[in-house]
Regions:
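Outer-membrane beta-barrel domain signature
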Residues: 2-7, 41-47, 94-100, 131-135, ...
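Residues that define the transmembrane beta-barrel architecture of outer-membrane proteins
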Residues: 10-12, 48-54, 101-105, 136-142, ...
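Outer-membrane beta-barrel "beta-signal"
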Residues: 60-61, 109, 209-221
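Detector for outer-membrane/organellar transmembrane beta-barrel domains
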Residues: 104-106, 110-166
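Hydrophobic/aromatic-rich structural module bridging two neighboring secondary-structure elements via a short loop
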Residues: 44-110
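Short glycine/proline- and aromatic-enriched beta-strand/turn motifs that initiate or cap beta-hairpins
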Residues: 1-46
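Repeated loop/turn-to-beta-strand initiation elements of outer-membrane beta-barrel proteins
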Residues: 24-30, 63-69, 80-83, 116-121, ...
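Transmembrane beta-strands of outer-membrane beta-barrel pores
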Residues: 4, 32-38, 87-93, 113, ...
């Protein structure tokens, strides 16, 4: 069992992502993500909260070396090194006890390396410049993913597991760990779906740990 699992709250994380290829080096990425959960409330006992995040990003290939024997046409998995710059806006929906508003700029780098038995190791480093309720902070996120392409039930799929660390420069401390397992299922040339389970450990906070089911819909053009 992960640390604090017995006292974790549960959330649902649906999202819609759209990827627009501009050429062999550039791609646009848009996202709309939703969070639904429950937290204790002094008057009503429990309160449902809903958060929403919108984002726009530009992806750029740094090392466009195409992988051999790739089953499916995939912009990011065909590239060994690429970077992303973007902006995200997040806020609560409706009246809640603890509303928030966040503006977030981000820069990230993703690299891929082959492993034995057709597995791949994917490293992502992300620097986030956050303004949450007029309070500024900078956060570094480092994620390692292990994935493998394989056919399941007549469809190409990409099962994966990953772990991620969050470092807050303002607190000068590791603030969060996140562990995730899921599978990306290729439905058509343009559509994919990604169900997953995620567990989030809060390391230096009174906030509860979070267990979440996620469902991403992905559109490629």
């Amino acid at each position: 069992m992960l640390p604090g699992a017995a006292g974790a709250s549960f959330e649902f994380w649906p999202a819609m992502d759209a990827f627009v290829k501009l050429d062999d080096r550039f791609r646009l990425y848009f996202t709309a993500a939703f969070v639904r959960g429950m937290e204790p409330d002094a008057t009503s006992g429990e309160e449902i909260y809903r958060d929403v995040t919108f984002g726009a990003h530009l992806d750029l290939t740094l090392k466009p070396i195409f992988r051999p024997r790739l089953r499916t046409s995939d912009w990011e998995r065909q590239r060994y090194v690429w970077v992303r710059a973007g902006y995200r806006y997040g806020t609560t929906i409706g009246e809640v006890a603890d509303p928030f508003e966040e503006h977030r700029g981000l820069l990230e780098q993703t690299g891929r390396a082959p492993l034995p038995s057709a597995f791949w190791l994917v490293e992502r480093s992300r620097l986030e410049f956050r303004d949450v309720d007029d309070t500024s902070s900078t956060r570094l996120r480092f994620r390692l993913t292990c994935e493998r392409e394989m056919p399941i039930g007549g469809r190409e799929t990409i099962p994966y597991v990953n772990g991620e660390l969050y470092y807050d420069f303002r607190a000068d401390a590791l603030k969060r760990q996140r562990y995730q397992s899921g599978v990306e299922v290729i439905l058509t040339h343009r559509w994919r779906i990604e169900p997953y389970f995620s567990y989030q450990v809060e390391m230096h906070s009174d906030d509860e740990d979070v267990a979440a089911l996620g469902l991403n819909f992905k559109y490629y053009r």
